[in-house]
Amino acid sequence: MNIIRLTVWQVPLTSHIAYNMSDGKICDTVATTVLRLDADNGLFGWGEVCPIPHYLPAYADGVAPALIELAPVIFAGDGLGLGVEGMMYAADRYLPGHRYAKSPLDMALWDLTARTAGLPLYALLGGLQTRQLPLYHSISCIDPDEMARIAATETARGITQVQVKLGADRDNAADIARLQLVRAAVPEGTLVYGDWNCGASRLDATRVGRAVADLDVMLEQPCATLDECAAVRDATGLAMKIDENAHDIPSLLQAWQLGCMDAVALKSSKFGGLSALRRARDLCLSLGVKMCIEDTWGSDITTMATVHLGAATPQQGIMNVCDLASYVAPRIAPDAPSRQGGFIAPPTGPGLGITPQDSLLGDPLLELTA
């Protein structure tokens, strides 16, 4: 089997509600990049990556040039014989770095391979181990009372885990109120965690954390470095989830050794695709670290790719996944599963098990042929 065509689209995804994070970062309308690989066996595979502006070392307009550079690897020969991980190893040797741009390529190769095998993608990533995956609901950093209202509404719909965005207004008192009011608004046992997305100083995160240390809450990535996050965890005694600083095996091991990684966000575009994410998943299972398996942003393709990896993970390792597609429009694969209460399940068809609609993608940004 050979890859004979690569097609790339850029699609604007608009959030249903503007998504405010710390340090002035906002998700409103963001370009997602969609990739399709066509093979000479008549099958195809889909991938997607959606970098948030000013968030991580990634940007939407960097994806297509990287794929052009990688064309000699993509069209080199028998991709199925080499395997997805073999092709991605060749891609890493040919073009070091640029993980976010390689992520949709890796995703599409896995989709194509699973379609060729006639199996759902989770069957190739570890088998179906967790059918119903718990979701979290992320709440934009807005007025504390409104955040509490949203939390109550979502938990009434079945959500059992709530992420509270912090730091958008640089107001410690408001962040303390956000955590207190959301915690009070949701049922006992609901997992509540406050996320600064690296935007807090060690001092501010410690002050906020100590003010809510009597509550059943967790903190997420308060500061820009793992050393600072570890210091905040030590000073507050609150469990911590690492996100932005987790991007490869060495960073996971460092966070574990520092004692600040009670949970971790494994995001496809940070690691470079499902191949690397699967290796990170296996390490976290060995360490006993709870995982949120997701990506930075995106629509149905990204959502389903990470849901398949989550479904192929033992239940004791899963903290949650994210139905990114529910936060944005358009839905580019209308047949993709949606949340049912506080859970989501993977499709059972071959590959990703979804059918992105060309009519929703617009004109291609890039077309390459072998």
PLM segments and residue spans:
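Metal-dependent enolase-superfamily TIM-barrel catalytic cores that perform enediolate-based chemistry
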Residues: 123-236
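Shared catalytic-loop signature of beta/alpha-barrel
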Residues: 224-239, 247-343
